[in-house]
């Protein structure tokens, strides 16, 4: 016997009816687990005790039937669904709630549940399921420090690169960037140097190729602290004349000696300026030994009051030659040589000029190298300028050729468009002219017919007038002649009536004949100009209506098959094209006997591939000869003989060409009927004449 566990039902009944809203979701999950446990069923070994007997071993035996009944009701009741209106949806748990399923107190179990269900029952009480493990704590939110650092680095790099780029465009921003941003000036200078090297690669290569020679400093020269130029103009103080010092007022020989020394120095300066420019190798070498300016000895005069002047112990310094370069045509080199020569002049005027001879020589060499380098840079610049001029000239020639080609293309395109417009206009004019000519011809034809009718009417009126005049004359004559010529007058009247009726019949016959001819021409034009089989019922009905009283025309129309004028007939070109397709199939079946099978068909198909096609006008009754003769006749336009040749085929060949023969017969029938109708129309014209 199946029954529900009492312990499970007690767990269900132990849950509160109205749970706390804050922990409602916990009770809902627990209720689901309890319902799942309650749905389990067990087999009972012993019989169920009577409801009225109270067990002495259970202290709460009176409540046992009620609990079992409630458990039965709870198990038999359908579990609440999600759409049940009596069941409230669980409230969302608050984030601040710290309740856990394991912290909720369980109701105490009754002693009846702890022991057996009855004294004689051997069923063990159901074991309680272990409580579910506590949920995992929510993972800590990621701080994203590495991502922020990466974004900060990228943003800083982009801002720095943008600042460097904008510094190359704006001078104000350049000052701000290089002053307040670290390493800003180095970055901007590096980019400017790269830009300069990309613009002038030849100058950059020459700068890289230059070998810096070690500089010879020479001996150290000590310069006094207050020597050289100063920003403040020194005030020259005129010293008071000292009569105790040596001078002209004491000795006249010293003044003469000083005058001679001054003249020698000025003469040396003029000699240096008048000398030609020395070569580079000679300018680097030290010059010859300096000339010692010896003062002219003064006259030996015995002077008892003053001593004779002494000879100079140290010889005078040699004058340093000025710098001379071959490329003095450059303004920069000229200024540099001029400044350097002024410096040499100043040094030469000093007594210690010999100390500066070696540095001056080295400076000359460096200046010569600088001059050569300037010339080389100028030559390179000229070569690069020439190369750019040649490239510009080539680009100009290329663009000119491209422009000429484009102009030629545009001209050719315009000519083609003009030609197309001319052709279209010519076609329009030709078409309009043809329409105009057709209209004029139609109008002329109508005018001619109307004129003919008018002439006939005038003739009839004139005849009637003559007739009346004749009648009047005859009547008068009869009156005068007492009706002697009454019989002759009656005969003349009858003749005139007959002639008038005859002329009317002639006109009607001519009109009908012309209309019949036009209708026949319309049928023939429709058949000849149609590219596909086209019905010609209306044209044939017009012919039949115009020749309704002509038995010959009616018989010719009746001889035409209804299929021919209802569906149309193929043109000669279509017949020839279809014959070629039919001929290929007939050749495949040309070797088949009358009662041929699949093998015979296959053999005939294979052998037809190797058969030679005949040319010319072959003689014979074989299939190939008949097909060749038929094709020649079709090319000549003789469809009647071609149909006769194809009709002479036998067996499968004739069966395959049956449809083509039917089309040819219909074409020949229509052609023959049209010829008969045209002949009849001509015959009627001859009869009228």
From Swiss-Prot:
It is found in: Mitochondrion inner membrane. The chain crosses the membrane at residues 149-168. It comes from the Eukaryota. The gene is MIC60. Keywords: Coiled coil, Membrane, Mitochondrion, Mitochondrion inner membrane, Transit peptide, Transmembrane, Transmembrane helix. Residues 169-689 are mitochondrial intermembrane. This is MICOS complex subunit MIC60. Residues 360-505 form a coiled coil. It comes from Blastomyces gilchristii (strain SLH14081) (Blastomyces dermatitidis). Component of the mitochondrial contact site and cristae organizing system (MICOS) complex. Residues 49-142, 234-308 are annotated as: Disordered. One of its GO terms (cellular component) is MICOS complex.
